[in-house]
Amino acid sequence: MPSSKKKKEDVPIASMAGLVRYYESEKEKVKISPKVVVVASIVLIAGVIIASFIIPPPL
């Protein structure tokens, strides 16, 4: 391992002037297809529009 990389890993977090340290390995997360997100958004928008016609706003 190069010495410059080793020095960067040994730097304490408090002395990094407020920089956030992100780790290389990510935890497994729920993966959703972009198509599912778009379709769900359209369905939600349509539901809100339909509900606004069915249920009148309070006076």
Curated annotation (Swiss-Prot):
Superkingdom in the source lineage: Archaea
UniProt key word Cell membrane: yes
Location in the cell: Cell membrane
Pfam families from the UniProt entry: Sec61_beta (PF03911)
GO BP term, example: protein transport
Membrane-topology annotation of the record: Single-pass membrane protein
Location (main, coarse): membrane
Entry keywords, A to Z: Cell membrane, Membrane, Protein transport, Translocation, Transmembrane, Transmembrane helix, Transport
Cytoplasmic side: 1-35
Extracellular side: 57-59
Record field: transmembrane: 36-56
GO CC annotation terms, alphabetical: plasma membrane
Keyword DNA repair: no
Self-association and partners: Component of the protein translocase complex. Heterotrimer consisting of alpha (SecY), beta (SecG) and gamma (SecE) subunits. Can form oligomers of the heterotrimer.
Protein function: Involved in protein export. The function of the beta subunit is unknown, but it may be involved in stabilization of the trimeric complex.
HAMAP family named among the record's database cross-references: SecG
Protein name (database record): Preprotein translocase subunit SecG
Organism field: Sulfolobus acidocaldarius (strain ATCC 33909 / DSM 639 / JCM 8929 / NBRC 15157 / NCIMB 11770)
